[in-house]
């Protein structure tokens, strides 16, 4: 073959094979690809699609299995975990049932979570979605306003879910949406007002169709809708909505309804223990939510009401030490990476829990307390090669000075790895 023929002979731009060595060569603008490379690329793409998160609802875990998983991350709240496990199981069982073309069509049951700040409402919803391997989105009800006013449209909630599902609409339509601070969209008074309540009752009205199940038009870039843009169509019929809120003040409404109206010497005296918020919330009725400011139609679309208890000292100590992502375990690991052993004594844990109770922040405030307490020592430790152990005692919350113990020989040694995990050895003295 002449050199001129070699130049004229076409080759695949990817594997370099000539047109004589392959069955077909497809031309593009200044580039060629053979049938073998096309087949290889197709296999790679198919493998990637198979590796994507699949929403497998055929092998749905039982309520006991769901609760067992929740127990690993959420301390206490036994009644809430059982109620949520059953509700989620029934929701996805309903999706499977409605695809079988039965005579009976099961309706959706969204969930309302009531509990004090820091009691675990958001964590429960997040953990459920993680276990079920379904797309999950968190929305803040305080940013929502009625259509036509400054703020977010309710459809933006669905956009977050679609984005978390990598724009796979079919996957997103079986996801979970958690709407936080739902109590903040309660209408301002029980009586209808002549002025529009655009961030209260107006938002409740806008959420009704989405909660019930509708084909919603979602702007792909978020923000307000305008007539000259394309929309993403998503059916919300099989999306599970969990709405959570602290509902500050609803306890007084429940008290007024439940207490016996008696005066004088025969009046019943309630102790502070009897007025525990978590116990009061268990007696909540739809009428109490109505008086709080939720409209009847909105209450009707959240038929499952789950209440959470206020966390006491014992529960907060368990939260600090027991879950897989416990704060004490996290800080111990951070110190271990600097070859320093960290120890919290029991009295210190009690003080941290009491401080969280005093601040009325629940479990959410634990990290802030520990971070404030450990800031100085975490700043100094990497530079102090002679420190081998740090002990946090009950005085550390006030003094912010843990007890420091020098390493043997004046210089710390690498902490021995646990369970066979390899660590890089640092220089020793």
Swiss-Prot record:
PROSITE patterns on file: CLPX_ZB
A GO cellular component annotation in the UniProt record: HslUV protease complex
Annotated spans, Disordered: 408-429
Start-end of Basic residues biased regions: 413-423
Gene3D superfamilies for the chain: 1.10.8.60, ClpX chaperone, C4-type zinc finger domain, P-loop containing nucleotide triphosphate hydrolases
Biological process terms in GO annotation: cell division; proteolysis involved in protein catabolic process
Entries under Pfam families matching the protein: AAA_2, ClpB_D2-small, zf-C4_ClpX
Residues bound to Zn(2+): 12, 15, 34, 37
Annotated positions binding ATP: 116-123
Domain ClpX-type ZB: 1-53
Keyword set includes Ribosomal protein: no
Gene Ontology MF terms in the entry: ATP binding; ATP hydrolysis activity; ATP-dependent protein folding chaperone; protein dimerization activity; unfolded protein binding; zinc ion binding
Source organism, top-level taxon: Bacteria
Keywords attached to this entry: ATP-binding, Chaperone, Metal-binding, Nucleotide-binding, Zinc
Task performed by this protein: ATP-dependent specificity component of the Clp protease. It directs the protease to specific substrates. Can perform chaperone functions in the absence of ClpP.
Oligomeric and partner information: Component of the ClpX-ClpP complex. Forms a hexameric ring that, in the presence of ATP, binds to fourteen ClpP subunits assembled into a disk-like structure with a central cavity, resembling the structure of eukaryotic proteasomes.
Family indicated by similarity: Belongs to the ClpX chaperone family.
Protein name as catalogued: ATP-dependent Clp protease ATP-binding subunit ClpX
Gene: clpX
């Amino acid at each position: 073959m002449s050199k001129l023929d070699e130049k004229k002979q076409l080759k695949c731009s990817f594997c370099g094979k000539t047109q004589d060595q392959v069955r077909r060569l497809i031309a593009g603008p200044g580039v060629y690809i053979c049938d073998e490379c096309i087949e290889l690329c197709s296999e790679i793409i198919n493998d990637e699609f198979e590796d994507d998160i699949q929403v497998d609802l055929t092998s749905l875990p039982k309520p006991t299995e769901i609760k067992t998983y929740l127990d690993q991350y959420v301390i206490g709240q036994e009644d809430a975990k059982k109620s949520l496990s059953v509700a989620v199981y029934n929701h996805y069982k309903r999706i499977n049932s409605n695809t079988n073309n039965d005579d009976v069509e099961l309706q959706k049951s969204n969930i309302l979570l009531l509990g004090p700040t820091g009691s675990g409402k958001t964590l429960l919803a997040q953990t459920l979605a993680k276990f079920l391997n379904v797309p999950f989105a968190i929305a803040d009800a305080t940013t929502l306003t009625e259509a036509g006013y400054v703020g977010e449209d309710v459809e933006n909630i669905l956009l977050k879910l679609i984005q978390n599902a990598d724009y796979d609409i079919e996957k997103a339509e079986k996801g979970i949406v958690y709407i936080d601070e739902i109590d903040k969209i309660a209408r301002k008074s029980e009586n209808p007002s002549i002025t529009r309540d655009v961030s209260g009752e107006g938002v409740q009205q806008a959420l009704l169709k989405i909660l019930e199940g509708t084909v919603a038009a979602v702007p792909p870039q978020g923000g307000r809708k305008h007539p000259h843009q394309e929309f993403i169509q998503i059916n919300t019929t099989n999306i599970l909505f969990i709405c959570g809120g602290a509902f500050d003040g609803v306890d007084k409404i429940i008290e007024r309804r439940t207490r016996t109206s008696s005066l004088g010497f025969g009046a019943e005296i309630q102790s502070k223990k009897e007025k525990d918020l978590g116990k009061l919330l268990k007696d909540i009725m739809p009428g109490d939510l109505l008086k709080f400011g939720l409209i009847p139609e909105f209450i009707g679309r959240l038929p499952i009401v789950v209440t959470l208890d206020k966390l006491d000292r014992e529960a907060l100590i368990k939260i600090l030490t027991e879950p897989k992502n416990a704060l004490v375990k996290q800080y111990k690991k951070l110190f271990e990476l600097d070859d320093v052993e960290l120890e919290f004594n029991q009295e210190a844990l009690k003080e941290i829990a009491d401080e969280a109770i005093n601040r009325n922040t629940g479990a959410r405030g634990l990290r802030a307390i520990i971070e404030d307490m450990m800031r100085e020592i975490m700043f100094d430790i990497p530079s102090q090669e002679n420190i081998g152990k740090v002990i946090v005692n009950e005085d550390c919350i006030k003094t912010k000075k843990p007890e420091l113990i020098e390493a043997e020989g004046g210089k710390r040694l690498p902490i021995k790895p646990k369970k066979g995990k390899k660590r890089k050895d640092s220089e020793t003295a």
